[in-house]
């Protein structure tokens, strides 16, 4: 069957009625060709008439909010979904109009730091903007995104070619539409990975011809591998759909620029997917890569890079089953059962629909398809599936080694002895599906510790001699967390798997070496100046019962944390020796203990200062929110510390 879209050809962006000027050509759209001729479908952009304002990227980190421009604050309100000038579904049209380029620039700046790959940048944009708009407005938004992404990512396979980034972003939107648009089902064939790569390369070659340049075979090969990774990612993870948040929710903008400039403990120049793709798996190479990249490489028989700093003792223990370094066996994995009411209109995935030249005013992008049903590898039925007598379990071979967990769901009921003799490569043929996850930021727990079983448990799955454990793995930018539950033959075996997972997670996950929380001028209820002044006032005026009524209290949320930072940076490379990492975790755990103690000591002062104030409940909510957050971090680092401590006693 011939593809409905065998060529993706860039066409010039020309305003209707304007004369063509070759010096101002740019790639702004794609004309879609079929094997049997033209489909007469295209997206036509409009040439932006507003020149970019140089010097607009000056560091404004320390400027007061009163010095920021009106365009900035307008962009902030749009970013937070609180701009009432137009319906939030029209935000893209609003930002993309020619006379609002300054606002668009500020809006894209609020997305900083942009992820290290173009698909991540596009996903971050679509998670903050309802991406339905007219063609020319979408085109301007993508062009601005391309320019700002290029300015901070200079060492990629795209070089300094802004138009290439623009082309690829548009191509990704078309691919997302093709893969996840319900209207295509049963009518037209879907893009294959090969078709997507060929069409995009065709558009890039045309752009090179227009610029009298040449796209080398070596560069094409690199780009093809990057595009293949993008395809695999989009195939399973549609672009997110922005939905308007509650106006009472905290604004996440006021500190984004601070987080970008002050997170000195980590480099903002992480390796790109391209650099990870070219990494050779040997002892001297070390990089962290996305889960999608790992899966794509594993499914295409490419070597996986080393994720950690390999030391002499690693050579002794890696591959020895039953140790912190390696756990390998056949377990039961809980399958995901989707609730009938799980999906809602707010969970629609992003799709793109290309309209014909005859209807240029129609909407370019429509969000039509609901998210695909997760596989058993995405999340389990519940964190305590073993208590549910209706839970379904599948046999799977699980291997944990060198910072990764390999999961092979078995086709047949093979004997354990036979499976243990199989290599990871031979296991592929024996599996109905398989997946590999990096254990970066992962956390495993034995479930029995957190479950109180009644006197007469009804579940047939509760067996005293069996163990159950869960593993939670953050999936990176704008994505979900994977939560899996496994069942072992014994509780001791469950503990062994948990220790191995947490051991590798502790080795891979960096520890903040700078400020754990950035100092903020916002008042959350425990500002030392406010509390001192209030205490002084009460001491000098003991009969005064007037509460605080004129304060500006913000909602607290983590300004800088591992979770937030890793959502911004898809790939973070780290090289730390095991003993040094253990020391870092100990120091960080002690710091968290001090923060928790100080936070507890603050509560009586806050109660006294804010008693009777209309802000009392808000500041107490802030206190509780921060307390729970600090405890969560403390529990996690304590688990990491315990695993590394036990391992250090062996080496």
Swiss-Prot record:
InterPro entries (UniProt xref): PH_GEF_YEL1, Sec7_C_sf, Sec7_dom, Sec7_dom_sf
Region (Disordered): 1-26, 38-69
Family classification: Belongs to the YEL1 family.
Entry-linked PROSITE patterns: SEC7
UniProt name for this protein: Guanine-nucleotide exchange factor YEL1
GO MF: guanyl-nucleotide exchange factor activity
Acidic residues biased stretches: 39-65
Annotated function: Guanine nucleotide exchange factor for ARF3 required for localization of ARF3 to the bud neck and tip and involved in actin patch polarization.
Gene field: YEL1
């Amino acid at each position: 069957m011939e593809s409905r879209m065998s060529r993706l050809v860039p066409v010039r962006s020309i305003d209707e009625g304007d004369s063509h000027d070759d010096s101002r050509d740019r790639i702004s759209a794609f004309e879609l060709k079929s094997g049997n001729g033209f489909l007469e479908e295209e997206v036509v952009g409009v040439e932006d008439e507003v020149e970019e304002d140089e010097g607009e990227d000056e560091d404004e980190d320390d400027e007061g909010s009163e010095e920021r421009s009106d365009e900035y604050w307008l962009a902030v309100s749009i970013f937070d979904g609180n701009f009432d000038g137009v319906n939030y579904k029209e935000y893209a049209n609003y930002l993309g109009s020619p006379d609002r380029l300054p606002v668009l620039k500020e809006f894209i700046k609020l997305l900083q730091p942009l992820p290290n790959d173009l698909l991540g940048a596009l996903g971050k944009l679509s998670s903050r903007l309802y991406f339905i708009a007219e063609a020319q407005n979408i085109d301007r938004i993508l062009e601005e995104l391309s320019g700002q992404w290029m300015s901070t990512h200079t060492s990629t396979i795209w070089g300094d070619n802004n138009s290439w980034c623009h082309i690829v972003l548009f191509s990704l939107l078309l691919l997302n539409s093709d893969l996840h648009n319900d209207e295509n089902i049963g009518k037209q064939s879907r893009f294959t990975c090969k078709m997507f790569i060929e069409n995009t390369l065709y558009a890039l070659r045309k752009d090179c011809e227009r610029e009298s340049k040449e796209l080398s075979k070596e560069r094409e090969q690199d780009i093809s591998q990057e595009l293949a990774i993008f395809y695999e990612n989009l195939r399973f993870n549609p672009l997110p759909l922005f939905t308007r948040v509650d106006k009472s929710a905290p604004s996440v903008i006021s500190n984004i620029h601070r987080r970008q400039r002050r997170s000195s403990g980590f480099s903002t120049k992480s390796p790109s997917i391209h650099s990870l793709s070219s990494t050779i798996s040997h002892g001297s190479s070390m990089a962290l890569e996305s889960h999608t990249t790992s899966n794509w490489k594993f499914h295409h028989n490419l070597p996986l890079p080393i994720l950690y700093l390999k030391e002499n003792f690693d050579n002794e223990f890696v591959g020895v089953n039953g140790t912190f370094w390696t756990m390998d066996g056949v377990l039961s994995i809980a399958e995901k059962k989707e609730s009938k009411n799980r999906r809602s209109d707010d969970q629609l995935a992003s799709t793109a629909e290309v309209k014909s030249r005859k209807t240029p005013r129609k909407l370019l992008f429509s969000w039509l398809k609901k998210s695909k049903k997760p596989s058993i590898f995405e999340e389990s039925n519940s964190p305590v599936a073993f208590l549910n007598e209706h839970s379904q379990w599948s046999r799977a071979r699980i291997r944990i080694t060198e910072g990764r967990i390999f999961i092979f769901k078995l086709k047949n009921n093979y004997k354990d002895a036979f499976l243990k003799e199989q290599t990871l490569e031979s296991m592929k043929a024996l599996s109905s599906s398989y997946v590999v996850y990096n254990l970066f930021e992962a956390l495993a727990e034995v479930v029995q510790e957190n479950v109180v079983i009644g006197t007469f448990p009804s579940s047939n799955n509760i067996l005293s001699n069996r163990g159950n454990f869960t593993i939670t793995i953050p999936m990176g930018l704008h994505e979900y967390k994977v939560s899996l539950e496994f069942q072992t033959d014994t509780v001791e075996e469950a503990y062994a798997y948990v220790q191995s997972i947490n051991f590798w997670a502790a080795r891979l996950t960096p520890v903040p070496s700078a400020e754990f929380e950035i100092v903020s001028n916002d008042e959350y209820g425990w500002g030392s100046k406010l509390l001192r002044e209030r205490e002084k006032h009460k001491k000098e005026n003991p009969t005064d019962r007037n509460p605080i009524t004129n304060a500006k209290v913000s909602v607290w949320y983590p300004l800088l944390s591992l979770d937030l930072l890793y959502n911004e940076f898809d790939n973070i490379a780290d090289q730390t020796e095991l003993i040094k990492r253990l020391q870092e975790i100990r120091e960080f755990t002690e710091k968290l203990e001090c923060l928790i103690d100080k936070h507890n000591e603050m509560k009586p002062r806050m109660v006294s200062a804010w008693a009777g104030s209309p802000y009392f409940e808000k500041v107490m909510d802030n206190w509780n929110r921060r307390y729970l957050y600090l405890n969560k971090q403390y529990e996690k680092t304590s688990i990491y510390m315990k695993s590394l401590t036990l391992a250090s006693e062996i080496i």
